[in-house]
From Swiss-Prot:
Keywords: Nucleus, Ribosome biogenesis
A Pfam family assignment: Ribosomal_L24e
GO BP, sorted A to Z: ribosomal large subunit biogenesis
Family: Belongs to the eukaryotic ribosomal protein eL24 family.
Designated name of the protein: Probable ribosome biogenesis protein RLP24
One cellular component (GO) term of this entry: nucleolus
Cellular compartments annotated: Nucleus, Nucleolus
Gene name, Swiss-Prot/TrEMBL: rsl24d1
Domain of life: Eukaryota
Subunit structure: Associated with nucleolar and cytoplasmic pre-60S particles. At the end of biogenesis it dissociates from cytoplasmic pre-60S particles and is likely to be exchanged for its ribosomal homolog, RPL24.
Gene Ontology molecular function, alphabetical: structural constituent of ribosome
Protein source organism: Danio rerio
KW Nucleus (keyword) present: yes
SMART domains: TRASH (SM00746)
Lineage start: Eukaryota, Metazoa, Chordata, Craniata, Vertebrata
SUPFAM superfamilies: Glucocorticoid receptor-like (DNA-binding domain)
Length: 161
C-alpha cells in the first residue's frame, strides 16, 4: 500500500481517497480534498497559502533540514520479503520517529525562545517608562522620617545624660 502526498498541502492521501489530476505531459497531481483541488485550479501558490506545509517550511516555522527527514524519501526498488529485515525496518522506523519528534520539539522551543526574549525586553522597557505608576514618589520618605526621628531621639537621650 503506497501512501501518496497531496500536491498542494502535503497531507497523506491514502488509496481510494482524494482526487488525481493528470496533465497533458503526464504529470500527476494528487489532492487530498476538494479544498486543495480548488486552490490548485485557481493557480494559488502553496508557499503563500498559510495553512499548507509548504508555507510553514518556507516561513521557517517547521524543521526543513534534518537527517531524520531523509527516511521518508520515496523508493521505487522492490525488495524481497525477509522477516528479519522487516522487523529491523519497523524498529528503525520507531526510533527515527521518536528522534524526529524530539528534534521538532526542540526546534519549536528555540523558535519560541526569541519571542519570549523580545516580550521580556518590551516588558522591562514599559516598566522603566512607567515606573512612576509602580513606585509612589513619597514611598521611601516614611522610612527616612522614621530614621531621622530615631536619630533625634538618640541625640536627645545623649544630651540629657
Amino acid at each position: 500500500m503506497r501512501i501518496e502526498k497531496c500536491y498542494f498541502c502535503s497531507a497523506p492521501v491514502y488509496p481510494g481517497h482524494g482526487m488525481m489530476f493528470v496533465r497533458n505531459d503526464c504529470k500527476v497531481f494528487r489532492f487530498c480534498r476538494s479544498k486543495c483541488h480548488k486552490n490548485f485550479k485557481k493557480k494559488r501558490n502553496p508557499r503563500k497559502t498559510r495553512w499548507t506545509k509548504a508555507f510553514r517550511k518556507s516561513a521557517g516555522k517547521e524543521l526543513t533540514v534534518d537527517n531524520s527527514l531523509e527516511f521518508e524519501k520515496r523508493r521505487n526498488t522492490p525488495v524481497k520479503y525477509n522477516r528479519e529485515l522487516w522487523s529491523k525496518t519497523v524498529e528503525a522506523m520507531r526510533k527515527v520517529e521518536s528522534i524526529k519528534h524530539k528534534r521538532q520539539a526542540r526546534f519549536i522551543m528555540n523558535r519560541l525562545k526569541k519571542g519570549k526574549e523580545l516580550e521580556k525586553a518590551a516588558d522591562i522597557s514599559e516598566v522603566k517608562k512607567n515606573i512612576h505608576l509602580i513606585k509612589a514618589p513619597h514611598a521611601g520618605q516614611a522610612k527616612q522620617l522614621e530614621d531621622k526621628m530615631v536619630q533625634k531621639l538618640a541625640e536627645d537621650v545623649e544630651m540629657d545624660e
